[in-house]
Amino acid sequence: MIITPPSTTTESWESESDDPEKGYGHDNEEEYGFFERGRGRSRRGRGHDDDDDDDDDDEDDEEQSPHTIKRKPNPQKEEFIYTLQEEKAVVRKFDRKVVVFMAVLYMLAFLDRSNIGNARIANMDSDLQSDPPNPQLYSYALSSFYLAYLLFEWMAILWRLIPAHVYVAVLVASWGVVACLQGVATSYPVLIGLRFLLGIGEAGFTGVPFYLSFFFRRGELALRTAVFISAAPLATSFSSTLAFAITSLSNVIPIAPWRLLFLIEGLPCILIAGIAWQIIPDSPQTAQFLTARQKKIARVRLQSEHQQAAPSSSGSGLSALKDPVAWTTSVIIMLTNLAYSSLPAFLPTILTAMGHSSLSSQALSAPPYLLSFLIVLVTAYLSDLYRSRGPFLICHALCSCAGYLVLAFSERMGLEPGSWLRYAAVFPAAVGFFNVVVLTIAWNVNNQKGGGKEKGVGFALMQVVGQLGPLVATRLYPDGDGPFFTSGMGVCAAAMGGVVVLAAGLVRYMDGVNKRWEREEKEREGEEGVQLMEGERGDKGGEGGFRYML
């Protein structure tokens, strides 16, 4: 597939009119319609101001600049005019106030989830092990988290039912308390129970990409999702660095390093929960950092895509369960989770089995995730720029598959356990699956037809099916398979190869559907004297202007 860059004409506009921070306009809650006029420099849609004196009509009598965007509900009502600069100012505020804060929260969540791998090689296993030893207890501790994660994935739909500032604050505080309690566990059964509770607390947070769709357009979502998800490799890198620092001080601190690790990484969540209650907006209209006019701009700018989406029907929520796109992206996430969930938990152990010391393994765990963090941001930016997900996803899945193949066949290739080539292969493996997760989540949300119901159900489906992967992933690297862990690496390689096949098939399917919708619309436009009433549009996705993002 050849990807051509989108036109950058609209992005180069510079406004000469109103200050984007100027707070005029009203908070009317009426919904806006939308329509497109040609492919010129200005977009026109439907919006309105209810008060006659709003904006003083100072721009209505002037010839309109190509730097302005008009929206109006019908010819009898005033046009709501705002500039591209004003729209960008609103988006920048969402980026700073919403996306960055959510990324910080996710970093803390992933930190509390994955630090068990570092704690294990910091003598946690020997302190908690039963008598006689049971080598499966560590895997049980990992599995209990993902079992709870799977059973409580339905909580992702609560983003529509509970105010976000309340929901997030409660979740963050709950998993922070449980994360700290891991540091005082006296046995593996206690730790297993705490990991289950941690999984419940973090399961509800999986709806953040869906929450971000309340604020951003489809074409803007991948980069924002990437900023959010990229906190995962950053958290793992930070956790490894912190574990290295704590472990290196093990001779001068009175508490076991692994206990201190849990306490230090859990406490910030408790502290930040109160901040979350105060600053997280439930929607653009409740964002305290927006002026009244900016709230109106935030509402109106999203109406273009809401109007282009396929109309919702009474069974629209359940219709998402029949959508092949939702199911395919769900299976892609499930396969990717085999690698995504296992490597952060087992990499320190794998590096130790390669012959590195415990201290060196903590340090060597960080670089692959730091590189993943940087490349995730670059990939997401390009994905949004070209409005394309599939080709980038396929490329990264291939890279991850290649890395795992090297690790899987390293013993047959005659490589030493501590070979530099084995360590180098970890980099494309990690970079690849982190990018696949980001792109697949954005792909799922982008391609759910209809309104919030369909998107909510489709996203919840992806989360539930996706969490079947980690239940298997926690058993991929038993100690007896070291130092090469051939079977686990082979499973991950096969999983990422399956992602390539599924993603390629999905791109082809959606491309065919898009072309069919275009043909049908051209045929309807060519029929003279036939007018479709609004109620006749049904749920045919393409008729509302909706197209799958490939």
Question: Where on the chain are the PLM-derived regions?
Answer:
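Extracytoplasmic gate region of multi-pass secondary transporters
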Residues: 117, 317-381, 441, 474
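Central mid-sequence intracellular linker of multi-pass
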Residues: 218-232, 252-322, 487, 492-528
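Helix-breaking motifs and short loop linkers at transmembrane-helix boundaries and internal kinks
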Residues: 128-129, 152, 163-164, 184-189, ...
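Helix-to-loop junctions at the C-terminal end of transmembrane segments
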Residues: 151-164, 374-388
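Extracellular/periplasmic helix-loop-helix junction of adjacent transmembrane segments
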Residues: 117-151
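Structural signature of the two symmetry-related core transmembrane helices
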Residues: 166-180, 391-406
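Conserved MFS/SLC helix-loop-helix module at the cytosolic interface between two early adjacent transmembrane helices
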Residues: 150-189
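Cytosolic juxtamembrane N-terminal segment immediately preceding the first transmembrane helix
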Residues: 1-52, 56-119, 126
